[in-house]
């Protein structure tokens, strides 16, 4: 038998070892991609950057009598096999992450060799590899020659049938209750071990010549239906969560949840929804309606790419805010530069009829400096470009033919008109009502409030808080540049070709001049506050767009995606709230963040139930 199964890796103890299936640093092979998809489906809670999953046997963590081949998945014995002192084992490349919850691998017996002294199981780091799994402390194994299980002892216990050539033995580790069971040819054999410690490695051991086994860590579908077993335990864990007792203080619990929902709606500017929710639940709103609408107006401008107008509106509604937040001002100005390249900021859209803002702000205007206040302006009407949404997909209602530069908005914009109704708070809490005018210095003037019909940023208009620009359609989180504004005179093989500013020389000069002023602002902030590497990187990324004739397709073109407006919008919104002594983050988001962090800590502590209590499972 030994001669018939000649040692595939005879000679050097490490002969036949390969690199573990890596593709030489290039693109992953189709097999590796399929493995990654299968592991992601089986173990979605595992962060493989922090805790990689076992994918192969380790060429560095084995006894010399073990040889590896076929991507370090095949194990063969190359020792003498005279007695138990010739036993040899190998561990997997990584321990089993606790975040798996349930972990499973299978081993196929390619050849039982001379005597079939094979062991399949688990072991901790540092356990002697000159032994079969299960013989030493923190080592566990199921042996093929007698069907016994070995739990950290040289004395085995009757467990299951023997196994031989052609059999497939599976090993399932339940990190929720600390147990392990085996399968043979797809059928469970029952619990083998209990009270298992954390951080165990899949392990196999061989002892006689000719023994060969192949491992399956997910490279191929398993014989055993592990996903059905996972569903069973997921239901148990989620049942525990749902059954958590709160009946004794149900009213208090509901009040907390209602306040969290209300504050979330207010934070993101869903004014009408927050008002309706407050009426239904009798929940007080901790901010005046006029102030919510002011923030809503500013967010809308940023999400539309009209950052220059957003800056001016912020300075008008909340004077001193940007002057006391130079980092925020610089972020906004860099974003404005990007939007000018994108053709969405009014500085390049309105060159033919310059607004007072354009004349006051550039060039040589102090408005770039955080030391100076706002300049007067009007807000452009967005009626022609206002987005709508169908089934969660944003689209534009602009009936005009698309050119690279949309016609400038009328100066008689309805968004600059004042509301005839005086602002009022909605179910405003008594404890905060006396301080409302102090905390919101300009929110109570009638010429700053805009009607609900114009300003309400409901979900149907802003899917997930992202507004679609004229040039980009957002479909399920992906961007399709199928409605790009192009200079009709610029054609490449019969197709429109995008150009910087649509080839408009005046707009290009406007961008260059603005860039010089932005550079001057960066230098000024450096002198006053010291060098800021984040500012330098932000500026370089923005300026790099000018190095390409088609910035949308360049290596830094991701900056032009509308989704990049979201972090800027969130930072500005949080700063406004913080300036009014309101939370800069909604409590609901803080609670979700805390829950996610608790699950990460559970995984690090080896508590496997964290895998089946993911926050995403409760977000609908």
UniProtKB/Swiss-Prot annotation:
Any idea which residues bear Phosphoserine here?
A: 361, 365, 367, 369, 422, 451, 453
What does it do?
Answer: May act as an adapter protein to couple membrane receptors to intracellular signaling pathways. Core component of the CTLH E3 ubiquitin-protein ligase complex that selectively accepts ubiquitin from UBE2H and mediates ubiquitination and subsequent proteasomal degradation of the transcription factor HBP1. Enhances dihydrotestosterone-induced transactivation activity of AR, as well as dexamethasone-induced transactivation activity of NR3C1, but does not affect estrogen-induced transactivation. Acts as a guanine nucleotide exchange factor (GEF) for RAN GTPase.
Question: How the protein assembles, per its UniProt entry?
Answer: May form homodimers. Identified in the CTLH complex that contains GID4, RANBP9 and/or RANBP10, MKLN1, MAEA, RMND5A (or alternatively its paralog RMND5B), GID8, ARMC8, WDR26 and YPEL5. Within this complex, MAEA, RMND5A (or alternatively its paralog RMND5B), GID8, WDR26, and RANBP9 and/or RANBP10 form the catalytic core, while GID4, MKLN1, ARMC8 and YPEL5 have ancillary roles. Interacts with RAN and RANBP9. Interacts with the HGF receptor MET. Interacts with AR. Interacts with TUBB1. Interacts with YPEL5. May interact with TUBB5. Interacts with DDX4.
Q: Which family does it belong to?
A: Belongs to the RANBP9/10 family.
Feature: compositional bias, Gly residues: 18-28
- Where do the CTLH domain residues begin and end? 291-348
| Residue ranges of the TM segments | none
Q: What happens when the gene is disrupted?
A: Mutant mice are viable and show no conspicuous phenotype. They have normal platelet counts and only slightly reduced proplatelet formation. Resting platelets tend to have a more spherical shape. Many platelets exhibit disorders in microtubule filament numbers and localization. The animals show a markedly prolonged bleeding time. Granule release is also reduced.
Q: Which SMART domains match?
A: CRA, CTLH, SPRY
Tissues expressed in: Expressed at highest levels in spleen and liver. Expressed in megakaryocytes and platelets (at protein level).
Quick one: effect of changing residue 301 to I? Complete loss RAN-GEF activity. Partial loss of RAN-binding
Q: What GO terms are given for molecular function?
A: beta-tubulin binding; guanyl-nucleotide exchange factor activity; small GTPase binding
Residue(s) carrying Phosphotyrosine = 362
Q: Which UniProt keywords apply?
A: Acetylation, Cytoplasm, Nucleus, Phosphoprotein
Give the B30.2/SPRY domain ranges: 35-222
Which residue intervals are annotated with compositional bias (Polar residues) in the record? 347-398, 437-450
Pfam families cross-referenced by the UniProt entry = CTLH, LisH, SPRY
**Domain LisH, first and last residues per copy:** 253-285
Subcellular localization is given as: Cytoplasm; Nucleus
Q: What is this protein called?
A: Ran-binding protein 10
Enumerate the residue ranges of region (Disordered): 1-38, 347-460
The record's InterPro entries line, in alphabetical order, gives:
B30.2/SPRY, B30.2/SPRY_sf, ConA-like_dom_sf, CRA_dom, CTLH/CRA, CTLH_C, LisH, SPRY_dom
Which gene name belongs to this protein?
Ranbp10
């Amino acid at each position: 038998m030994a001669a018939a199964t000649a040692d595939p890796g005879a000679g050097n103890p490490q002969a036949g070892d390969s690199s573990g299936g890596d593709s030489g640093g290039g693109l992953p092979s189709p097999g590796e991609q399929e493995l990654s998809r299968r592991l992601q489906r089986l173990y979605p809670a595992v962060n493989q950057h922090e805790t990689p999953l076992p994918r192969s046997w380790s060429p560095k963590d084995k006894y010399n009598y073990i040889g590896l081949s076929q991507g370090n998945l095949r194990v063969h014995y190359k020792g003498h096999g005279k007695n138990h002192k010739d036993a040899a084992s190998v561990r997997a490349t990584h321990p089993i992450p606790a975040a798996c919850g349930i972990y499973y691998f299978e081993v196929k017996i390619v050849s039982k060799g001379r005597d079939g002294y094979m062991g399949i199981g688990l072991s901790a780091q540092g356990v002697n590899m000159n032994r079969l799994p299960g013989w030493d402390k923190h080592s566990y194994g199921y042996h093929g020659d007698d069907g016994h299980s070995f739990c950290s002892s040289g004395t085995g216990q009757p467990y299951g049938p023997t196994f031989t050539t052609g059999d497939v033995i599976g090993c399932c580790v339940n990190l929720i209750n600390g147990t392990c069971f085996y399968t043979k040819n797809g059928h469970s054999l029952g619990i083998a071990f209990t009270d298992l410690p954390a951080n165990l490695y899949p392990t196999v051991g061989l002892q006689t010549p000719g023994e060969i086994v192949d491992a399956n860590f997910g490279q191929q579908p398993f014989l055993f239906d592990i996903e059905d077993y996972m569903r069973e335990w997921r239901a148990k864990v989620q049942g525990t969560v749902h059954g958590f007792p709160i009946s004794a203080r149900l009213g208090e619990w509901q009040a907390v949840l209602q306040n969290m929902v209300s504050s979330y709606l207010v934070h993101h500017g869903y004014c009408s929804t927050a008002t309706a929710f407050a009426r239904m639940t009798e929940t007080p709103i901790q901010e005046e309606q006029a102030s919510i609408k002011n923030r809503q107006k500013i967010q809308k401008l940023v999400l539309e790419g009209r950052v220059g107008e957003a800056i001016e509106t912020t300075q008008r509604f909340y004077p001193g805010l940007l002057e006391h937040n130079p980092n925020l001002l610089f972020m906004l100005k860099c974003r404005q530069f990007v939007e000018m390249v994108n053709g969405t900021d009014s500085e390049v859209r309105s060159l033919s009829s310059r607004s007072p803002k354009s004349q006051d702000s550039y060039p040589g205007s102090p408005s770039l400096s955080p030391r100076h206040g706002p300049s007067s302006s009007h807000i452009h009407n967005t009626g022609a470009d206002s987005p709508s949404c169908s089934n969660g997909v944003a689209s534009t209602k602009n009936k005009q033919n698309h050119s690279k530069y949309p016609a400038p908005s009328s100066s008689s914009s309805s968004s600059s008109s004042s509301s005839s109704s005086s602002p009022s708070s909605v179910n405003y809490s008594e404890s905060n009502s006396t301080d409302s005018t102090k905390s919101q210095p300009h929110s109570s003037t009638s010429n700053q409030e805009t009607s609900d019909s114009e300003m309400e940023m409901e979900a149907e208009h802003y899917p997930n808080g992202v507004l679609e620009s004229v040039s980009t359609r957002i479909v399920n989180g992906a961007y399709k540049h199928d409605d790009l504004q192009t200079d009709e005179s610029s054609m490449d093989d019969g197709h429109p070709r995008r150009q910087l500013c649509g080839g408009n020389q005046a707009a290009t000069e406007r961008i260059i001049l603005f860039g010089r002023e932005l550079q001057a602002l960066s230098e000024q902030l450096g002198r006053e506050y010291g060098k800021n590497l984040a500012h330098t990187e932000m500026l370089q990324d923005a300026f790099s767009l000018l190095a390409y004739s088609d910035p949308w397709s360049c290596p830094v073109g991701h900056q032009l995606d509308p989704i990049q407006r979201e972090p800027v919008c969130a930072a500005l919104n949080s700063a406004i709230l913080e300036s009014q002594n309101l939370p800069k983050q909604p409590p609901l988001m803080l609670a979700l963040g805390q829950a996610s962090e608790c699950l990460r800590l559970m995984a690090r502590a080896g508590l496997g139930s964290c895998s089946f209590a993911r926050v995403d499972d409760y977000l609908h």
